[in-house]
Each structure stands twice: as structure tokens, then as C-alpha cells.
């Protein structure tokens, strides 16, 4: 009799635990009213404005809470695995994945580099191809930077034109650097950063002072000097400078996050291309005004 009672109680306990797990799981994927307000502000406001550092700090804290609650490695991994079917995620789920991509652009260069990772995730989810990682890391951010509603970008708002502008300007700038008399081989990484910034301004016009000072104050960290004359390596090392700026280890994209997101890249060259690709999107969306370009 005692054994039967114990078995019944055990079964009830297991069932109760299962119900609680399901309930908690469902709750964790449902925005509460306060979170809906925050999310609405992020995805519908092209340029977020706060009156003080304290307001920014409070807002950033709420965004971090949202990211921690909804964008766990497990959720990201799931999104990546089912992302080849763009209809597999609801629009709200897509927005939540893009969410962590947005505040970096809205808050400026030092707002957080993790948008590169999450923008890439959004790319694979939305476009359904690994190749899109090289483009969407910048595209979602560019929507925020130039006043394009990110939700519209998800629905396909002229993404091809944005990609062409991003890729075109990046290629022009790199070609200008590599075909000039600049001594890239013997130049320090920081000197190259300064030169690239100067060349950009000569080609495309001045950068805002605050943005320019932020770029030029980057911590070059572990970058090895002199950098290689090889364009791909030069691009990758320049990207690493930005990774270091935000305190993220320079192999975070190519090792830990790719493993979490269940992506297998064939070799180190492919990893380098992905790293450089995400960085290209970052530079393009952050440094270059896209709106109104042909």
C-alpha cells in the first residue's frame, strides 16, 4: 500500500514538475506589459533619445534583462537550426532575435558589439542561408542607424539595395587603401585605422566628431604589428580591433558562438571570411550613412 502511495505521489510530483516547466517555458517566451513597452520603443524608434546618462543606463539595463531572458544560447541554437525555413519563427520571435542587434547602433559605436553576433543570427533565421551571415550583421543595424524600421527590414525592405551600398563602399575603401602608396606592411594597426578613417572622409565626407573620436580611441589590444598586406587578413585584423574595443575575445565569433549556434565551418579560411564579413557589415552600417545613397 505504501509503495502504491509512493508511486502515485511520485507520478503526481513528476507531472506537476512537467506542468511547471511547460508553464515557465511558455512564460519565458511571452512579453509582459513592461517588456512590450520597451520592445516597442526599440523596434519603432529609428534613433533613440535619452535625456541623461542615468536614463541610458536604466534603458540599457532593461534591454540586458530582455536579452538575458529571451536570447539564451539554447534559443539562438534553436533559431539557427530551424532558421532555414523562414516561416518557422513567428514575427515576434524574429524581433526578439533582432532585439539584441539594435541597441548597439542606437547607442553609438561603444553601445555593444554583440549586435554583430545577433545580427548574424537574425540573418540566418530570416534569409535561411549561412552566406547571409556576411550581410545581415550590418543590415539590421543599418536599419536602425539610418531610420529604417527594423521590422520593415525583416519584411524585406529594399535589403538588396542596402547590401549593395554596404558592399560597394567597403570595397571602394579597401581598394583605395591597398592600391595607394600607404605602407600597409610596416604600418601599425592603429596607424592603419587612422588612415582608413582619413581615406573614408576623403571619399565620402566627414564623420561626426563623436563617432570619429570613438573610432580613433579603439583599444588595439592583441593585434599583431605589422599587419599583413593581404586584404583578407588586413580586414580580419581590423575587425579584431573592434572586437577588442568591446572587451570580447577576438575568437568569440569563430569558436564559442559558432559552436553554440550549431554552425560548422570547413576550415580556418572560411572562419576568417565570416569574421571579416560580419565586421564589414559593422563598419558599413556604423560609419557610413546609407540613406539616400544610389
Would you name each region that the model predicts?
Residues 10-18:
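Hydrophobic helical h-region of N-terminal Sec-dependent signal peptides
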Residues 85-150:
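Hydrophobic, gly/ala-rich membrane-insertion helices/peptides used by toxins and envelope proteins
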Residues 14, 26-92, 145-294:
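Acidic/polar, low-complexity intrinsically disordered N-terminal segments immediately downstream
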Residues 6-8, 97-98, 135, 260:
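Short amphipathic alpha-helical "recognition" segments used for binding
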Residues 19-23:
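C-terminal motif of bacterial Sec signal peptides marking the signal peptidase cleavage site
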Residues 1-11:
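Bacterial N-terminal signal peptides that target proteins for export
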Amino acid at each position: 500500500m505504501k509503495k502504491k502511495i509512493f508511486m502515485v505521489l511520485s507520478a503526481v510530483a513528476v507531472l506537476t514538475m512537467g506542468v511547471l516547466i511547460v508553464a515557465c517555458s511558455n512564460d519565458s517566451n511571452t512579453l509582459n506589459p513592461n517588456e512590450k513597452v520597451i520592445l516597442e520603443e526599440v523596434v519603432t524608434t529609428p534613433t533613440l533619445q535619452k535625456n541623461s546618462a542615468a536614463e541610458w543606463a536604466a534603458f540599457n539595463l532593461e534591454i540586458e534583462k530582455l536579452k538575458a531572458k529571451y536570447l539564451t544560447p539554447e534559443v539562438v541554437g534553436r533559431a539557427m537550426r530551424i532558421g532555414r525555413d523562414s516561416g518557422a519563427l513567428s514575427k515576434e520571435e524574429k524581433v526578439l532575435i533582432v532585439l539584441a542587434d539594435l541597441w548597439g547602433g542606437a547607442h553609438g559605436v561603444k553601445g555593444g558589439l554583440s549586435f554583430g553576433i545577433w545580427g548574424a543570427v537574425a540573418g540566418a533565421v530570416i534569409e535561411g542561408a549561412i552566406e547571409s551571415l556576411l550581410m545581415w550583421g550590418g543590415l539590421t543595424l543599418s536599419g536602425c542607424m539610418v531610420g529604417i524600421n527594423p521590422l520593415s527590414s525583416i519584411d524585406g525592405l529594399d535589403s538588396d539595395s542596402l547590401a549593395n551600398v554596404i558592399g560597394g563602399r567597403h570595397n571602394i575603401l579597401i581598394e583605395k587603401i591597398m592600391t595607394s602608396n600607404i605602407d600597409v606592411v610596416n604600418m601599425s594597426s592603429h596607424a592603419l585605422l587612422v588612415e582608413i578613417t582619413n581615406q573614408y572622409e576623403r571619399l565620402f565626407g566627414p564623420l561626426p566628431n563623436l563617432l570619429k573620436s570613438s573610432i580613433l580611441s579603439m583599444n588595439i589590444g592583441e593585434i599583431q604589428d605589422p599587419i599583413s598586406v593581404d586584404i583578407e587578413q588586413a580586414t580580419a585584423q581590423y575587425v579584431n580591433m573592434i572586437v577588442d574595443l568591446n572587451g570580447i575575445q577576438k575568437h568569440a565569433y569563430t569558436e564559442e558562438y559558432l559552436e553554440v549556434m550549431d554552425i560548422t565551418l570547413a576550415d580556418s579560411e572560411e572562419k576568417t571570411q565570416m569574421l571579416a564579413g560580419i565586421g564589414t557589415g559593422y563598419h558599413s552600417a556604423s560609419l557610413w550613412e546609407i540613406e539616400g545613397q544610389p
